[in-house]
Swiss-Prot record:
This is ATP-dependent RNA helicase DDX51. The modification Phosphoserine is found at residues 79, 432. It comes from the Eukaryota. It is found in: Nucleus, Nucleolus. Residues 64-76 have a biased composition (Basic residues). GO terms for biological process: rRNA processing.
Length: 639
């Protein structure tokens, strides 16, 4: 069998000079002489130095062994030795190579050690430089938060103060408001404007200072976006300027269109418009689908011998019903539309798949051609601002967006086609990197009413209904609002609370028709209903006076949902409390979510078992009755 000669790697210097046996032996003898000299010198030292040196030599030898191990490489030569002495020569060769490798490690350091007898052997042997960068030898730095790159109008909004109890503006301080409207405000018990109203009303009145037919200087006014907490008076902020701008109209046309996501919210806004147009010739129409299409058509247009006559100046509508009238109502025209108001704008943007906004804009800029009626007053789609485009003034279409959770996503806002928009916000604008560290830690993504207190209650799934009943009974609230994530949960909780007794309870969901929901809300406002169990249908913009307590029976899945739910209380400067029932698996995610929302303080509210014990007997009886009721309802559905 042929045997292969394996050469050992003896370091870069040996590799460069050639691994010959003579050279390796010479280096080994030199190294041996140096080591013998060093040993004799150590014997002459004092005992304590000898002890120290011996320990250091052992550590150096151990370190040398650890270094040598990874440096060994196996290299197969191409020649074979046929004689029987090859294995023995191979071993001798390997030993010599190892000794040579030791001599090549650091000859300068060893010679320095021989010249300095008092040197520490640990310092003589230096570690080879690391082949790569060593990670971990750096201090941890706080990573600066990356600021989003936003358009200028989003990054630098017009800041509005938050407090609706301290930062009030007397109505006399805004003389631009018409005296008749000021008188109407006082008649409704309003003597001061909230911060949002004091900022937005003058801006809107300025855009209509020369009438609603043309903008300031003949140019199109900027669109306005308002982001403010729930209960801060956003509705009145657009009702007052719109009514004042249309006070002196001569011919009745649809000049203002308010689009809202729900029927209940549309009813509420229509009610506010009716209050402030009661003493004016302006007419308000509600288009939500609560009445038949024919009935709504009668309130919008009237057929005459010459064609159709418009009967409404202000239309409050939901998106679906509005599109129905655009398609199916003869004489329904938006060509004279001056104000397009989108309330709860974030939700309306999410419903853009219905394509209601492009339909409205197309109807507003519809042209009958040069031979049509009022051809001189017909307007065209907005284009680039040039000298030619300003020669013929036309009535602008101004868009007004209002929401408590207005998105800052430029991609979503781009769908609205805003013209030189201006943002009013209670949140801080985008800060420079230098100012970011100085921003208050509580200034988060959204703002909340000042008088609102936030709590979370850890609990088990089986005890959630019992905790709801305990909170309502112990706090003695005249009006409490409880939110669930589904219609089924709302219905079962309603049946359980009804079987438990002691609480006047009602259910508010899509299970009931518009007429029934309106009746339930009215009874709740009058105090006839103590606990209203609802889905998120009432979480958007519904202003129910006197709600003292909001309970999240099911934890909200999204941040915006939480903002709108808890915003049903602590409205218009009043105080309120919000409790969220959390399972153990929900706590971490929920707490992280609300911390990003800018909640000032979330209180941990633990309910001891002994406080729930007196209610357990009635609760178990109600559970058994609930089971029977659910079975009966299932039989009725199956029948």
């Amino acid at each position: 069998m042929a045997l292969f000669h394996i050469a050992r790697y003896a370091g870069p210097e040996a590799a460069g000079q050639g691994d010959t046996d003579a050279e390796a032996g010479s280096r080994a003898r030199v190294l041996l002489e140096r080591l013998q000299n060093r040993a004799r010198e150590r014997q002459q030292r004092e005992p304590e130095l000898e002890t120290t040196g011996t320990a250091g030599e052992g550590e150096a030898a151990a370190a040398g062994k650890r270094r040598r191990r990874p440096r060994r490489r196996r290299r197969v030569s191409g020649s074979a030795t046929p004689n029987s002495e090859a294995p023995r020569a191979k071993r001798r060769k390997a030993d010599k190579d190892v000794d040579a490798g030791r001599g090549e490690e650091a000859p300068e350091e060893l010679s320095a050690g021989a010249e300095d007898p008092g040197a520490n052997p640990q310092e003589d042997v230096q570690r080879p430089p690391a082949p790569g960068r060593v990670l971990g030898d750096f201090a941890r730095r706080k990573t600066p938060k990356v600021q989003p790159f936003l358009p200028a109008w989003l990054a630098k909004p017009s800041c509005v103060k938050k407090s609706v109890t301290e930062d009030l503006t007397p109505i006399e301080d805004i003389p631009e408001v018409h005296p008749d409207l000021q008188k109407q405000l006082r008649a409704n018990g309003i003597t001061s404007y909230f911060p949002v109203q004091a900022a937005v009303i003058p801006a809107l009145l300025e855009s209509a200072d020369h009438g609603f037919l043309i903008g300031r200087g003949g140019y199109q006014p900027s669109d306005l976006c308002v982001s403010a907490p729930t209960g801060s008076g956003k509705t009145l902020a657009f009702v007052i300027p719109v009514v004042q701008a249309l006070l002196h109209r001569v011919v009745c046309h649809i000049r203002a269109l308010v689009v809202l996501p729900t029927k209940e919210l549309a009813q509420q806004v229509s009610k506010v418009f009716n209050i402030y147009t009661d003493t004016t010739p302006l007419r308000v129409a509600l288009v939500t689908g609560q009445k038949s299409l024919a009935k709504e058509q009668e309130s919008l247009v009237q057929k005459t011998a010459d064609g159709f006559r418009c009967l409404a100046d202000i239309v409050v509508a939901t998106p679906g019903r509005l599109v129905d009238h655009i398609d199916q109502t003869p004489g329904f025209s938006l060509q004279q539309l001056r104000f397009l108001i989108i309330d709860e704008a974030d939700r309306m943007i999410d419903s853009m798949h219905q394509s209601w906004l492009p339909r409205v804009v197309a109807a507003a800029f519809y042209s009958e051609g040069p031979t049509g009626s009022c051809a001189l007053l017909q307007r065209t789609q907005p284009q680039a601002l040039t000298a030619a485009s300003t020669c013929v003034p036309q009535m602008p279409l101004q868009k007004l967006l209002f929401s408590a959770t207005l998105t800052q996503d430029p991609e979503k806002l781009q769908r609205l086609g805003l013209y030189q928009p201006r943002l009013f916000s209670t949140r801080l604008g985008q800060q420079s990197p230098k100012d970011t560290a100085e921003v208050d830690e509580n200034s988060g993504k959204y703002t909340f009413p000042v008088g609102l207190t936030h709590h979370y209650v850890p609990c088990r799934l089986s005890s959630k209904p019992l905790i709801v009943l305990h909170l309502v009974l112990r706090m003695s609230c005249s009006r409490a609002l409880c939110f669930t994530n589904s219609r089924e949960n709302s219905h079962r909780l309603y049946l359980l609370a009804q079987a438990f007794g002691g609480v006047s309870v009602a259910e508010f969901s899509s299970r009931y028709g518009p007429g029934q929901r309106k009746k339930i809300l009215k009874q709740f406002e009058q105090g006839k209903i103590q606990l209203l169990i609802s889905t998120d249908a009432t979480a958007r913009g519904i202003d129910v006076q006197g709600v003292e307590l909001v309970i999240n029976y099911d934890a909200p899945q999204y941040l915006r949902t939480y903002v709108h739910r808890v915003g049903r209380t602590a409205r218009a400067g009043k105080t309120g409390q919000a409790f969220t029932l959390l399972l153990k698996v929900q706590e971490r995610k929920f707490l992280q979510m609300v911390s990003e929302a800018g909640v000032p303080e979330l209180t941990h509210h633990e309910i001891p078992r002994k406080l729930l014990q007196p209610l357990v007997a009635r609760y178990e009886t109600a559970l058994s009755q609930l089971e029977k009721t659910v079975k009966e309802e299932q039989k009725l559905k199956a029948a």
